[in-house]
Amino acid sequence: MIDKLDSVLAQFNEERVYNNGEYYRLKKFDDDTYELEVSISGACGTFESHPAIKFKIIPESNQVLFLSYRDVVVNPMKHFKPESEAELDFVKLAFEQLLDKCDQVKSSC
């Protein structure tokens, strides 16, 4: 996962990349904290997260700490800080899938 994450960190930034009806973006908050987001067009020019995962990279251990998960397109929408093991497993799987999608998007550009 870290290799794919390094690739995404190198290839994406705050400028949205459009691909097949979705927008991909990596927002950087500080040296180690990011949000990886896939969004779709919403009403009146907004972007709706589907999903957005905020995370922190722990440099000493090269581990990823998940800070929040947001998906406003699903019903009911989800917005939470992963705390339980089930929530962490859910976010980790979603994050790995998101990394794969980002990798495919950059490969097709």
Role assignments for model-derived ranges:
Residues 75-109:
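Compositionally biased, intrinsically disordered linkers/stalks adjacent to structured regions
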Residues 36-38, 51-55:
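A short beta-strand signature
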Residues 41, 66-78:
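Short, solvent-exposed aromatic-acidic interface loops
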Residues 1-42:
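Negatively charged, low-complexity tracts enriched in Asp/Glu with abundant Ser/Thr
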Residues 19-22, 47-53:
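Short, surface-exposed coil-to-beta transition loops
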Residues 35-36, 64-68:
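Short hydrophobic/aromatic-rich beta-strand segments that constitute the beta-sheet cores
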Residues 26-31, 56-63:
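A short, structured loop/turn motif at beta-sheet edges
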